Amino acid sequence: MPKLLPPVVLAGCVVALGACSSPQHASSLPGTTPAVWTGSPSPSGAGAAEAAPAAAPSITTHLKAPDGTQVATAKFEFSNGYATVTIETTANGVLTPGFHGVHIHKVGKCEPSSVAPTGGAPGDFLSAGGHFQAPGHTGEPASGDLTSLQVRKDGSGTLVTTTDAFTMEDLLGGRKTAIIIHAGADNFANIPAERYNQTNGTPGPDEMTMSTGDAGKRVACGVIGAG
């Protein structure tokens, strides 16, 4: 009668056999050992394009001449605590070559042959009122005073300028606002008192120069926020 091996010996053989068996390698072939999961999934969105950053809030306004001819577009982009204002002419020959004053005015109206809120004789776009002042701001330069637009000989021009004098909410609040291009250059009331006197003998700029920059007639207007 054959002798039976003790249980301990059998267990040792099983362990030995397991230790001597060839290792199994992960494979992607059908019917073979599946890949071993390590517990670390592939990076989320690997291979996919990264999401584009959110666009800055903006307003685009179309400026027109008194006869309705579109003259320029103005885009206001708000980010990092300031506004970037881009003005581009859209019709050559409407604006004369040279510098043109550009201001934001305090009433969102662009009416040809209209009367100013303070009264007086009618004129183009006068119902837009004077230069815009942001809430809590007084004095010159006004909040709505922007860099002048320089027009080339062919009547076209582009201006990119920045300002932290107002927010988007300021421009769209209350009666809204309008952006106006003037016929002439803005002197920004730079009339040195030590060199120039008013007609009445008072040195420095007068009230008209302080409030308008002597930029002349209003030749193009667009209500901000009206498209």
Curated annotation (Swiss-Prot):
<feature type="lipid moiety-binding region" description="N-palmitoyl cysteine">
    <location>
        <position position="20"/>
    </location>
</feature>
<feature type="signal peptide">
    <location>
        <begin position="1"/>
        <end position="19"/>
    </location>
</feature>
<keyword id="KW-0049">Antioxidant</keyword>
<keyword id="KW-0564">Palmitate</keyword>
<dbReference type="InterPro" id="IPR036423">
    <property type="entry name" value="SOD-like_Cu/Zn_dom_sf"/>
</dbReference>
<keyword id="KW-0479">Metal-binding</keyword>
<dbReference type="InterPro" id="IPR018152">
    <property type="entry name" value="SOD_Cu/Zn_BS"/>
</dbReference>
<feature type="binding site">
    <location>
        <position position="145"/>
    </location>
    <ligand>
        <name>Zn(2+)</name>
    </ligand>
</feature>
<dbReference type="GO" id="GO:0005507">
    <property type="term" value="F:copper ion binding"/>
</dbReference>
<keyword id="KW-1003">Cell membrane</keyword>
<keyword id="KW-0560">Oxidoreductase</keyword>
<comment type="similarity">
    <text>Belongs to the Cu-Zn superoxide dismutase family.</text>
</comment>
<keyword id="KW-0449">Lipoprotein</keyword>
<feature type="compositionally biased region" description="Low complexity">
    <location>
        <begin position="39"/>
        <end position="55"/>
    </location>
</feature>
<feature type="lipid moiety-binding region" description="S-diacylglycerol cysteine">
    <location>
        <position position="20"/>
    </location>
</feature>
<dbReference type="GO" id="GO:0004784">
    <property type="term" value="F:superoxide dismutase activity"/>
</dbReference>
<feature type="binding site">
    <location>
        <position position="103"/>
    </location>
    <ligand>
        <name>Cu cation</name>
    </ligand>
</feature>
<dbReference type="InterPro" id="IPR001424">
    <property type="entry name" value="SOD_Cu_Zn_dom"/>
</dbReference>
<feature type="binding site">
    <location>
        <position position="182"/>
    </location>
    <ligand>
        <name>Cu cation</name>
    </ligand>
</feature>
<comment type="function">
    <text>Destroys radicals which are normally produced within the cells and which are toxic to biological systems. May play a role in favoring mycobacterial survival in phagocytes.</text>
</comment>
<dbReference type="Pfam" id="PF00080">
    <property type="entry name" value="Sod_Cu"/>
</dbReference>
<dbReference type="InterPro" id="IPR024134">
    <property type="entry name" value="SOD_Cu/Zn_/chaperone"/>
</dbReference>
<keyword id="KW-0186">Copper</keyword>
<keyword id="KW-0862">Zinc</keyword>
<protein>
    <recommendedName>
        <fullName>Superoxide dismutase [Cu-Zn]</fullName>
        <ecNumber>1.15.1.1</ecNumber>
    </recommendedName>
</protein>
<dbReference type="GO" id="GO:0005886">
    <property type="term" value="C:plasma membrane"/>
</dbReference>
<keyword id="KW-1015">Disulfide bond</keyword>
<feature type="region of interest" description="Disordered">
    <location>
        <begin position="23"/>
        <end position="55"/>
    </location>
</feature>
<feature type="disulfide bond">
    <location>
        <begin position="110"/>
        <end position="221"/>
    </location>
</feature>
<feature type="binding site">
    <location>
        <position position="105"/>
    </location>
    <ligand>
        <name>Cu cation</name>
    </ligand>
</feature>
<keyword id="KW-0732">Signal</keyword>
<keyword id="KW-0472">Membrane</keyword>
